[in-house]
Each structure stands twice: as structure tokens, then as C-alpha cells.
Amino acid sequence: MLNRLRALLSPLAHEQSLTLSGDAQSSLQRYMGYEPADVDMLRTHASVPARLSGDHCIDGFGVKTLYECVPFASPDSLDLARLQHPIPDDGFHAEGIEYVALLDSIERFSTEGSFVAVEAGAGWGPWLAMAGVVCRSRGVERIGLIGLEASRERFALMRRHLDFNLLDQQHGVAVDLFEGAVWSHDGVIHFPESALEDMGAAASTDSIDIDYRGHPVTTREVPCTRLPSLVGEGRKVDFLHIDVQGAEVEVISSHLTWLNQN
């Protein structure tokens, strides 16, 4: 594993990235992070023809996304080739390594018939939905999806997105959604009010009027939790995606023991 990481971070990584992606340019991909075998693995999973419908799109993994759930992306800007095979990225929100990481986790850890995914700073819950849809297509019997989102509006989009993909208790999926933020303690922190299409809002320990981007903001108190409190002590997590806009150091450093145990 260490040798693989060295290879992925080597000076040749950028050149290899262009080769693997057919010289496609990407504003989302910061570093490649994957190898040719990972691209092959991704393609084996992307067996559903990507297409655009009246109110939603379907990607190569079978995930259906309502346009209303991604208000920052215009349907006219979506690239079917990237929706089919998101290398070097999917063209609108995530780079290839994120897809590879989730698929690799599913292949490694769902073999005993269960899979638990956690998405913190989930937005509309794209990785929860993909985990659920892919696991269901593989016949995984016990699927657990745990999502955290501090924005009221985006929390509603996450629930809508999961329901639209039939990922709910009624369809045999254990879903636990927390309207709040992941943090270093259980309690409350501050989160800015922001436009629905602004995916860059970040929580803070104190009330602020200027955010990390220099934007004026008005914050409100929201619940916060440590992951062990929400997930449960001793419960196995197979995939964890954290996107908390710069608070990753605060969150991860306070969860090291729990992360190492998982």
C-alpha cells in the first residue's frame, strides 16, 4: 500500500492522469489518485446507459439525480460521457478518485452481505445514494446509510435524493440522517445561512460575520455530533466521505482513535 501511495503521488502522476483520461481536461481533479486497474474496475460497474430525462439524469451506476437536487449545475451542461465514466471527473461535482474509492470499498467490504456508508457534509447525499444503488445492484442484503448535513435546505435535498432512488426503510435500507454537523464534540456550533446552490458553506465554533472565503454571512446555531455518537460505538463503517469545507483537520484529529478502530 505504501509503495502504491508513493507511485500515485510521484511526479509522473499528472502525465499518467492525462493518459488515463484521454487527455481530457478537468477543473475538478486535483491529483489522479487512481491506477489503470482502478479505471477498469470503475468501467465494470458503470453498466447502466447514462441518460438525461425531463427532470433528472441517470449516471452509469444507475443513480438517478433530480436536477432540483443539484441547483448549481445546469442540465444543459451535463456531459453524458462523463456521467457514464467519471474519469477524470463526472463533469459537474466530483473527481474520479472519489468514485474509485467508493467502488473499491464496496468490492472489499460488502462480501459478507452488509455495507455501511457515512457521508458527513453530505449536501444532497451523492455518495450515500451511489453506495446504496451499487450495493443493491450487487445483491448486498444489509445496507446502512448515515448522512449528516447542517443546511436545512440541503438536508431536505438529501432526503429527497435518497427517496427518489428508493433508498429508505420501506425498501429495506437502513437510513439514519442527522440535520447538523460533524464536529469534535456533541452539542451545538454555528453554521451560515447560504443560497441553496452554494456548496461551500462551513461550520465554525463561534458566530462569525465573514466566512473563510471573505463572504459576509449570518450564522445560526445547529446541532453537532461526533461520529461515534451518531454511528454507535463498535459499529463497523465501510466507507466514510467527509466534505466539511476546511474543518477536516478539526474533525479528523478529534476522531483518530475511532478511525483507527474502524
What are these model-predicted stretches?
Residues 2-262:
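Phosphate/nucleotide-binding beta-alpha loop and adjacent structural elements of enzyme active sites
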